[in-house]
């Protein structure tokens, strides 16, 4: 398992739309350069890892929209100025979040199971703990190809940065700090 971190503001180039298939070119026209740059970086990295041409790679999508590419499992996350591309030889999910003031207790009560709530509400830095738990929950649902609305299906216990999954056939989860002011987590099958 490995992941690459990019500072999006440092990626100052015009994307090569010829590396993208027509559907992604149309999406880039709607969403802008940042989308095109992210997709170009992803396709170039997949090409480096597989030897395939970036424009010829055909992704499939899970019922909840997770992009899949069987020759090289991957996942993408971006927040604010941070982009993370994660790769593994089996299923993988990644999430990065920029920490910012928000009503995290309300979000936590809506999306987290009791074991997760206990893990961050009893600690001294609830904002950091919340974002760590949130990233772990997102990484787990993305690993499964599911949606955050189903996060309670993937319970875990949180203890000082350590994630212990509480369900059968659970993946490994590692937390990390991709850059100052950001938190990340990656879930991957061993």
Residue ranges and their predicted role:
Residues 1-190:
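Core catalytic alpha/beta fold that binds nucleotide/phospho-ligands
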């Amino acid at each position: 398992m490995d992941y690459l971190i990019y500072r999006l503001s440092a990626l100052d180039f015009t994307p090569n739309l010829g590396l993208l298939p027509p559907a992604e070119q149309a999406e880039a026209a709607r969403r802008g350069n940042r989308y095109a740059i992210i997709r170009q970086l992803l396709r170039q990295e997949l090409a480096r890892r597989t030897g395939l041409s970036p424009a010829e790679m055909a992704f499939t999508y899970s019922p909840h929209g997770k992009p899949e590419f069987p020759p090289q499992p991957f996942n993408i996350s971006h927040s604010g100025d941070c982009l993370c591309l994660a790769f593994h030889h089996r299923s993988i999910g990644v999430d990065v979040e920029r920490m910012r003031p928000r009503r995290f207790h309300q979000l936590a009560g809506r999306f987290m199971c009791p074991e997760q709530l206990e893990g961050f509400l009893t600690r001294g830095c609830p904002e950091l703990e919340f974002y760590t738990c949130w990233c772990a929950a997102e990484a787990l649902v993305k690993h499964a190809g599911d949606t955050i609305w189903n996060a309670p299906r993937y319970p875990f216990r949180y203890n000082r940065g350590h994630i212990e999954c509480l369900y059968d056939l659970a993946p490994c989860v590692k937390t990390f700090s991709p850059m100052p002011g950001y938190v990340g987590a990656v879930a991957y099958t061993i």
